[in-house]
């Protein structure tokens, strides 16, 4: 009995004493698994998101917005391969885990290079080029680059030209896209006509029912009137604004009908601005006041660059509003008055006149092409046939280099006896238009497009103008693969002379 008690006491004593083995004692934690971070960047060093990274075949992951992805280091040399949409794949060999535990893989983009030209092969600048989400603009030499390109359709558009496209299969190499000139068949809506609901509706119906595919709307006319509530403060300050329409409404009507939208801005005949700021006007050497035409209109001095500010501001606003093309009228030196008394700030000899006008239009083209608008210049028809600038600064060869469209005003009624061998040129509308174009077109190198104004009104010698006379002019123009614009001061046109719409 005593032995039993002793044994039990020893047992209890042992159970109450310290343990001989502590759980986990002497077991070290497993070392952390090393990781390698891969940063995928483009040729500029910027991170590429959504790039696929292959870690030697044992792991694949996509980069985040920071271009980074991490995976376990396999404790052996590994080939890291990276690829991304619009880039050439690339790889690097990693022999040992770097101290920074980071490597960088640079991908070179897939680049499509090309050139935009007209049908004759002349470069076309400021064309919008797109391939999926990748966009670019053609440069002055017509060249463009599409970076990060994927196979698909290359689309090219440019105001004054028809859009074009081609399928690109992903093969690198230069491509050429040739644009055909847009064949415009247009009428003109004066400010009052555009602002009259019935007259505007009639012009839209005319376009819907006939071959008309464009409309010219006056922004500023020969009297200097601006026909909408412009944000160009100068127009309000000089009292030139007479609100007739909302351009947003007119443009919406044109876009709804897929009609090409042109606005006409009279550049240098402006009595409002010349009266308010006589220092911008042509001077009169005899009277010491601004020079005036026989009809009392003041003319701005084209050699004074300050006189350019106002018409260019209106042009930029018109382009921003959504017009496709900005057409400058009266973009010349003055006529129809005592021009021998006209004085200018800058050179006004033949060379000086040409430099002033071409410089103004070049400035307009520089500003407006970059905004997506074409630039057109109206010119006297006489400059197509006669050499020199005819005192106007409209040297046709020089103008062709600085505008997208040249619109000679070929009105048979404005030709005097003897022109083209006719006693009354007005009685030979088709022949007059054809002869004038044949004289001038060889002198107008591309990519400038020739698009004449032609006559839809009765004036001068001969009979009245109607279906036959208007159609003969249209036919003469179209035989030369050109578009045209009908002029009528009241915006009332001879519908019977027009072909039905498609």
Language-model-detected regions and their locations in the chain:
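Catalytic domains of carbohydrate-active enzymes, especially glycoside hydrolases
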Residues: 199-225, 320-325, 405, 480-484
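Aromatic-lined carbohydrate-recognition surfaces of secreted/lumenal glycan-active proteins
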Residues: 262-270, 327-328, 353-392, 447-459
């Amino acid at each position: 009995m005593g032995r039993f008690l002793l044994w039990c006491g020893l047992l209890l004593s042992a159970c109450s004493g310290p343990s001989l083995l502590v759980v986990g004692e002497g077991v070290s934690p497993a070392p952390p698994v090393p990781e390698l971070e891969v940063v995928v960047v483009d040729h500029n060093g910027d991170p590429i998101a959504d790039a696929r990274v292959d870690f030697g075949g044992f792991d694949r992951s996509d980069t985040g917005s920071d271009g980074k992805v991490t995976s376990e280091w396999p404790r052996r040399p590994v080939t890291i391969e990276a690829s991304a949409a619009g880039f050439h794949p690339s790889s690097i060999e990693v022999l040992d885990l770097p101290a920074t535990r980071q490597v960088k893989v640079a991908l070179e983009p897939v680049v499509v290079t090309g050139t935009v030209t007209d049908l004759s092969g002349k470069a076309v600048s400021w064309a919008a080029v797109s391939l999926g989400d990748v966009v670019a603009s053609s440069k002055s030499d017509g060249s463009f680059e599409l970076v990060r390109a994927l196979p698909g359709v290359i689309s090219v558009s440019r105001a004054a030209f028809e859009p074009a496209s081609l399928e690109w299969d992903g093969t690198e190499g230069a491509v050429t896209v040739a644009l055909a000139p847009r064949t415009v068949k247009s009428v003109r809506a004066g400010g009052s006509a555009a602002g009259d609901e019935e007259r505007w509706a009639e012009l839209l119906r005319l376009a819907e029912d006939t071959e008309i595919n464009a409309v010219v709307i006056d922004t500023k006319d020969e009297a200097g009137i601006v026909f909408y509530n412009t944000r160009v403060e100068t127009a309000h300050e000089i009292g030139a604004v007479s609100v007739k329409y909302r351009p947003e409404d007119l443009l919406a009507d044109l876009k709804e009908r897929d009609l090409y939208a042109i606005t006409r801005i009279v550049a240098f005949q402006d009595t409002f601005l010349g009266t308010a700021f006589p220092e911008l006007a042509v001077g009169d050497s005899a009277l010491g006041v601004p020079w005036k035409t026989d009809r009392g209109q003041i003319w701005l001095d084209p050699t004074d660059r300050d006189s350019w500010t106002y018409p260019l501001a209106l042009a930029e606003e018109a382009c921003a509003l959504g017009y496709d093309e900005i057409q400058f009228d009266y973009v010349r030196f003055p006529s129809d008055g005592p021009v021998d008394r006209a004085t200018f700030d800058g050179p006004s000899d033949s060379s000086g006149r040409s430099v002033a006008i071409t410089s103004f239009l070049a400035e307009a083209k520089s500003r407006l092409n970059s905004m997506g608008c074409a630039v057109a210049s109206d010119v006297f028809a006489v400059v197509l046939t006669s050499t020199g600038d005819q005192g106007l600064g409209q040297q046709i060869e020089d103008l062709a280099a600085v505008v997208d469209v040249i619109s000679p005003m070929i009105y048979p009624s404005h030709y005097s006896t003897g022109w083209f061998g006719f006693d009354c040129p007005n009685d030979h509308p088709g022949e007059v238009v054809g002869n004038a174009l044949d004289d001038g077109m060889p002198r107008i190198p591309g990519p400038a497009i020739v698009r004449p104004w032609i006559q839809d009104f009765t004036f001068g010698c001969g009979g009245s103008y109607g279906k036959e006379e208007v159609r003969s002019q249209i036919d003469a123009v179209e035989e030369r693969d050109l578009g045209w614009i009908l002029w009528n001061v009241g915006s009332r046109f001879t519908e019977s002379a027009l072909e039905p719409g498609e």
